[in-house]
């Protein structure tokens, strides 16, 4: 997606309201494969850049007084003309159907995503206005951001909440075998977050072939791996070939 492109979305057919992105994400993911399935699961660094109309620094005054933010964004790679009342969550093996409003599937009537991220700083770019630096984002590079709201701990945190099937395997992690000669090809500042991503098992839940080689682009690199039982083995790290 062109980061300068502003996408209009018809949100309410009755009132005719139009919702426009105010910003977009710069992240290390140029493909959906490998992106954590929820925010906050890996210490991924990203930046929020505003479109020209919203680059007034006054709009982010006071933002640094918060530690976390809510991002409201668009599943820009999952827009469909039709919608289905049920979807098949990967966590359930890809065969069991659940109501779309009982999941966080990207295939929704309105392709809206919601992510809680950590705010690490705000800088001012003389040409492009304020840049918001975040950690823990689960967003594709170029994702349109519709709104940014502060996370309010006393209102937004619900430790007693139930999470249905989404929490059934939340503590499952793979052991990651990353040969030093391959790990050294990854910038040191990206190594920790990459290992966290791999430990989360990027594969679709229904693919368990131990001989298959998987790959995804990350931070300008192509990461290839295979999984055998509970261990992930990194096979190759090469420069990403841009299409």
Predicted regions and their residues:
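Conserved positions in beta-strands of structured domains
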Residues: 117-120
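Mixed-charge, low-complexity intrinsically disordered regions
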Residues: 1-112, 124-133, 137-243
């Amino acid at each position: 997606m062109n980061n300068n492109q502003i996408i209009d979305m018809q949100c309410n057919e009755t009132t005719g309201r139009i919702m426009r992105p105010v910003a977009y994400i710069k992240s290390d993911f140029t493909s959906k494969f490998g992106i954590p399935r929820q925010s906050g699961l890996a210490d991924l660094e990203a930046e929020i850049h505003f479109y020209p109309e919203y680059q007034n620094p006054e709009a982010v005054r006071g933002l640094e007084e918060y530690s976390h933010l809510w991002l409201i964004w668009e599943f820009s790679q999952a827009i469909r003309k039709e919608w289905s009342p049920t979807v098949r969550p990967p966590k359930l093996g890809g065969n069991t159907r659940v109501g779309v409003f009982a999941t966080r599937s990207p295939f929704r009537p309105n392709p809206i995503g919601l992510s809680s991220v950590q705010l690490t700083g705000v800088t001012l770019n003389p040409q492009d206005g304020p840049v918001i630096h975040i950690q823990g984002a689960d967003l594709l590079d170029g994702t349109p951001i519709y709104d940014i709201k502060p996370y309010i701990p006393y209102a937004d945190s619900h430790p007693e909440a139930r999470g249905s099937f989404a929490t059934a395997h939340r503590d499952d992690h793979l052991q990651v075998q990353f040969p030093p000669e391959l790990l050294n090809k990854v910038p040191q500042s990206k190594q920790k977050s990459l290992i966290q991503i791999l430990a989360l098992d990027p594969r679709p839940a229904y693919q368990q072939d131990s001989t298959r080689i998987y790959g995804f682009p990350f931070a300008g690199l192509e990461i290839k791996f295979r999984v055998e039982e509970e261990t992930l083995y990194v096979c190759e790290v090469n420069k990403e070939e841009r299409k």
